[in-house]
């Protein structure tokens, strides 16, 4: 065995091979080669400095020394001497030799032959010194003459072919003592050891990342600064590394001879075109012997094989997670550091992986290479096309062994399996809530942090999920991509379309086992079940009131805090619920989408239309168990029940008067404040209640939509019509328990009761006199003001017969 030389431990790359390496791999190669040379010099083995080392020290491309030899070669022709030593062209059978000759078929020189004894293109020794146009043979440096029978790969040097043979034997004799990883070649082990031994002495001041070479940190700093000093003279494109510019120039000037017939995309290598075609067709030639999974590229199969032995030597120091590849660990670390080195030049968005940036760029270019043969729809990713194809086949290959449910995608099956195990490994440190997926936990954490990274460019509104931003954007564009095939109605969300479809089929698949009531949606059934159990797990810490839903508790808390987060941009009025704001906005727009088919009356809310329809049908499904009285609304029945209990939970702090309903208390408080916030635009008259203003407005329009079928008399309010009808029926449902007197209206009964109780709640501020009716107080106040709207005889009538006054009013 001869003495060890640098070329015994060196690895050489041709231009094509060098371009396949990424920046990190190229830098690692430079560092290893330079270190190997320094070690040989230290041992006194290396004598002269190889061209490769000189090239690497000057930060030039390592394939340049090889290129110099290529430059001197000219197209070969047949040698005029020693013709008998060369094979005739028609007798050449070796595929690589034929390929070598084909490279020069466009030359003017013909009859290029190969030397017999070498079975390869060789140099003619006789004419080494005297070249002329027709007396040259192809030099050995111009071809790859060493062939390997397993993969028909060719090499410039015999030593390189021997190294390549080792990769096919699958023997990995060189083992790392640190992590146990094995390699088939000693230089590869030497490269690997650097990961464990080398000290990162060069640190970036910006992000704190450390490097083992000053040249690498110089390049890294350009990521932070955004500096791109290398400009292409042809197209003006700039780069942060010279190697990137060199690669770009090759691709810019190089002929792309290999064109895809399907999509028209061109490539400078036939091998890349072949790989591209395989991706388009979906063929997967490379199959795993362990699990039978197939791949369209051999490199993907090689990566996949590492899953089976379970070897994961690269461990994250932050979270302890282990990986098969150092590159995967590097990508993973960016999750902890938040580093996003790959920035889009169009919009400035940054990514932690180069592949994500490549995919993102297609948004700007609108490139969609992957087309569905069934419907013609195109996609920017092959994975999206694969998913899409399952729509046409309706095939669901992924089946759950527990319940037999099938899915189109393996990811959905994995999600489904967790429903059986109940496993929730990802826990929130703030509130302790657990989740099935880390992505769901990440989204949940934003509730605590308040982070909203997704911002609308039109109105500036921010969201904590990208899907919410996408849905929100449709408000500005008015896009409604989800259309109902039955009635043509369109929706901005697929979930809304799914709900809408149930209107047409009238199917209610979710049935309550307790009472048999059926529902269209599972969420409604869940809500309904609580009515049977009476469970109210969500309790208010302020007042102790309990609720059966967390959302209702959240809304309730706003009563105590006074928070009204939903504000109207038109008038500034604020609301505690977004639904109330939506309803309120219709006042300004005048929108009334919900129209009654019977009488043509329109409403701003569907619930109001549903209630209104019961007037025509006469349906009163809600019946009081105490007195048998029926109502067309459940809320009206609830209010009615309080009459029987005499419970008055809502008390006025000013005068101590109690009320059955909070709305009545609110109205009552206005008596004390004297506030009249609702003003008529026609005559300027102000009112305490919005309902009173609405009734007043009808005076100006003269509209009386409510007509009595018996006598034809019309009214401007439905309540007045109901009261009027009692004249015809003679009905007096409201009876006094003290004296037995009956009344048509509950208000008359309440006024009458004050005769027995002697209650006089309406007091004059001037003289202190009290009255049992508000109208009497109003009449009395005119004595102090001197106002005389009525003649003395009229006043006498009013005072002696309050019922008559009531009728006049």
From Swiss-Prot:
GO biological process, alphabetically ordered: regulation of transcription by RNA polymerase II
C2H2-type zinc-finger residues: 174-196, 202-224, 230-252, 258-280, 286-308, 314-336, 342-364, 370-392, 398-420, 426-448, 454-476, 482-504, 510-532, 538-560, 566-588, 594-616, 622-644, 650-672, 678-700, 706-728, 734-756, 762-784
Residue stretches making up the KRAB domain: 7-75
Compartment(s) of residence: Nucleus
Keywords, comma-separated and alphabetical: DNA-binding, Metal-binding, Nucleus, Repeat, Transcription, Transcription regulation, Zinc, Zinc-finger
Disulfide bond residue pairs: none
Main location: nucleus
InterPro entries: C2H2-ZF_domain (IPR050752), KRAB (IPR001909), KRAB_dom_sf (IPR036051), Znf_C2H2_sf (IPR036236), Znf_C2H2_type (IPR013087)
UniProt GO MF annotations: DNA binding; zinc ion binding
Keyword Transcription among UniProt keywords: yes
UniProt note on tissues of expression: T- and B-cell lines.
The protein's role, per its UniProt record: May be involved in transcriptional regulation.
Family under the similarity heading: Belongs to the krueppel C2H2-type zinc-finger protein family.
Protein name: Zinc finger protein 43
Species assigned in the record: Homo sapiens
Gene behind the chain: ZNF43
């Amino acid at each position: 065995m001869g003495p060890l030389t640098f070329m015994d431990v060196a690895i050489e790359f041709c231009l094509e091979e060098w371009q396949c390496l990424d920046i990190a791999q190229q830098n690692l190669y430079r560092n290893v080669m330079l270190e190997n040379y320094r070690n040989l010099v230290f041992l006194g083995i290396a004598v002269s400095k190889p061209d490769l080392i000189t090239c690497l020290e000057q930060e030039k491309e390592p394939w340049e020394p090889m290129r110099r030899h290529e430059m001197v070669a000219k197209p070969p022709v047949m040698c005029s001497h020693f013709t008998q030593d060369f094979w005739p062209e028609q007798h050449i059978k070796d595929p690589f030799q034929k390929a070598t000759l084909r490279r020069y078929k466009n030359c003017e020189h013909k009859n290029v032959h190969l030397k017999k004894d070498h079975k390869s293109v060789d140099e003619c020794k006789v004419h080494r010194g005297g070249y002329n146009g027709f007396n040259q043979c192809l030099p050995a440096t111009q071809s790859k003459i060493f062939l390997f029978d397993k993969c028909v790969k060719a090499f410039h040097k015999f030593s390189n072919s021997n190294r390549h043979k080792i990769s096919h034997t699958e023997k990995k004799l060189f083992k790392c003592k640190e992590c146990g990883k094995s390699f088939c070649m000693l230089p590869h082990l030497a490269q690997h050891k650097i990961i464990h031994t080398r000290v990162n002495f060069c640190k970036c001041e910006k992000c704190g990342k450390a490097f083992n070479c000053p040249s690498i940190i110089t390049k890294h700093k350009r990521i932070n600064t955004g500096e791109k000093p290398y400009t292409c003279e042809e197209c003006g494109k700039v780069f942060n590394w010279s190697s990137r510019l060199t690669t770009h120039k090759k691709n810019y000037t190089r002929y792309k001879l290999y064109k895809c017939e399907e999509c028209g995309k061109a490539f400078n290598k036939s091998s890349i075109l072949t790989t591209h075609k395989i991706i388009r067709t979906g063929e997967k030639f490379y199959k795993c012997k362990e699990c039978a999974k197939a791949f369209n590229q051999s490199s993907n199969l090689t990566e996949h094989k590492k899953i089976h032995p379970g070897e994961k030597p690269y461990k994250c120091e932050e979270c302890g997670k282990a990986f098969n590849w150092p590159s995967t660990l590097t990508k993973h670390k960016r999750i902890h550091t938040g580093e996003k080195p790959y920035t889009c030049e169009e919009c400035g968005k940054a990514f932690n992986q180069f592949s994500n940036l490549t995919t993102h760029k297609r948004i700007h270019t609108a490139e969609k290479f992957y087309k569905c043969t069934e419907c013609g729809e195109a996609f920017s990713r092959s994975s999206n096309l694969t998913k899409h194809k399952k729509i046409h086949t309706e095939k669901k290959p992924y089946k759950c062994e527990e319940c037999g449910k099938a899915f189109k995608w393996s990811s959905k099956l994995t999600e489904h399996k967790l429903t059986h195990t109940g496993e929730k490994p990802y826990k929130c440190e703030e509130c302790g809530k657990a989740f099935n997926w880390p992505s769901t936990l990440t989204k949940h954490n934003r509730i605590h942090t308040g982070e909203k990274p997704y911002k609308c460019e039109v109105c500036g509104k921010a969201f904590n999920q990208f899907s919410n931003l996408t849905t929100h954007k449709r408000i500005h564009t008015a896009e409604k991509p989800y259309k109902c095939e039955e009635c043509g109605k369109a929706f901005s969300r697929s979930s809304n379309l799914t709900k809408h479809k149930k209107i047409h089929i009238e199917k209610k698949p979710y049935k309550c086992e307790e009472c048999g009531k059926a529902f269209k949606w599972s969420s409604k059934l869940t809500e309904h079940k609580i009515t049977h159990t009476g469970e109210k797990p969500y309790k208010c810490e302020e007042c102790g009131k309990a609720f059966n839903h967390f959302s209702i508790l959240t809304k309730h808390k706003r009563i105590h805090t006074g928070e009204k987060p939903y504000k109207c941009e038109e008038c500034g009025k604020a609301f505690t619920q977004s639904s109330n704001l939506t309803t309120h906005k219709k006042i300004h727009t005048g929108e009334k989408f919900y129209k009654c088919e019977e009488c043509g009356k329109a409403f701003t809310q569907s619930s109001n239309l549903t209630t209104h329809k019961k007037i025509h049908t006469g349906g009163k499904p809600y019946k009081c168990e105490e007195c048998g009285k029926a109502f067309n609304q459940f809320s009206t029945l609830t209010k009615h029940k309080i009459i029987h209990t005499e419970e008055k939970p809502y008390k006025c702090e000013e005068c101590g008067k109690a009320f059955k309903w909070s709305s009545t208390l609110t109205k009552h408080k206005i008596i004390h404040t004297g506030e009249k916030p609702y003003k008529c635009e026609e005559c300027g008259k102000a009112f305490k209640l919005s309902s009173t203003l609405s009734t007043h407005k009808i005076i100006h329009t003269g509209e009386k939509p409510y007509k009595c079928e018996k006598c034809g008399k019309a009214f401007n309010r439905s309540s007045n019509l109901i009261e009027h009808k009692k004249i015809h029926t003679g009905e007096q449902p409201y009876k006094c328990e003290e004296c037995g007197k009956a009344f048509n209206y509950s208000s008359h009964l309440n006024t009458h009761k004050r005769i027995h109780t002697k209650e006089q709640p309406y007091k004059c501020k001037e003289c202190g006199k009290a009255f049992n009716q508000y109208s009497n107080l109003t009449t009395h106040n005119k004595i102090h003001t001197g106002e005389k709207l009525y003649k003395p005889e009229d006043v006498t009538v009013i005072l002696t017969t309050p019922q008559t006054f009531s009728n006049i009013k």
